[in-house]
């Protein structure tokens, strides 16, 4: 825990200007308030898209806070030079595009169904396949960027155990346990979770079906590995090499926007959790600890929600 606190103190004292943090918080409070007060994205399903227009809108939802974060950084640190760099513009536009295309698999759902086994397990196979394809959509373009730009400079954006220590992350995960348990009593939480137990017509109450639910939970967790890799790996380690600590809070703003539609508490906490994990990822050069925390919290949310459903 001392390492976590020490890293946070060092960032707050030496890297962060209070005005920058305050402006980011004001912007994100307004952005989240407008979304949850007026339900601006209710008509847009952030997971399943039927038109190119929906994907473009999702891209803009991600791009907007990411761009504002960098604009605020430039304003408070008087660093407008990065806006004259073609590489910055490429990364600024490229990153939200890659993440918004995760849902591209849904354009081909009928084709995928035709290739998978039929019967009661069809939806199970589809959801597992969708997880793999969504993650490949992230990994492949970012891997090509790393191969061209950073292969000789760093491991694959945080996929390393060098400088990694498990203990601080286990402490963080332990702190999250009572928070998740308390959240699990909220109606909006139980409306969202457990996500892994919607495999109609399979039923968790049927002993013959139960194995499919737990297999899917493994795939569900696989998804979080690559979300962590994208946000704390690519968006920080690739950007930090060129733009320094200014990349941290714009990443957190972007990260909040992917939580729209989820319980409000989860969306708010994503900013602070993403920032803390981001500081540690930059300090260690590894996303391994972030994966432990993110995956552990995700499965904990599934498990606590399941207990409420079956008890």
Question: What name fits each language-model region?
Answer:
Residues 5-24, 49-56, 77-98, 118-131, ...:
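Interfacial transmembrane-helix boundary/kink motif in multi-pass membrane proteins
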Residues 21, 60, 89-93, 168-174, ...:
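Hydrophobic alpha-helical transmembrane segments
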Residues 26-37, 95-105, 176-186, 252-260, ...:
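Aromatic-anchored segments of alpha-helical transmembrane domains
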Residues 36-70, 79-147:
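Alpha-helical transmembrane segments in multi-pass membrane proteins
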Residues 67-75, 138-152, 222-241:
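Transmembrane alpha-helical segments in integral membrane proteins
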Residues 100-137, 143-223, 311:
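Juxtamembrane helix-loop-helix connectors linking adjacent transmembrane helices
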Residues 158-170, 226-250, 279-286:
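Membrane-interface helix/loop boundary segments of multi-pass membrane proteins
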Residues 248-311:
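Functionally important transmembrane alpha-helices
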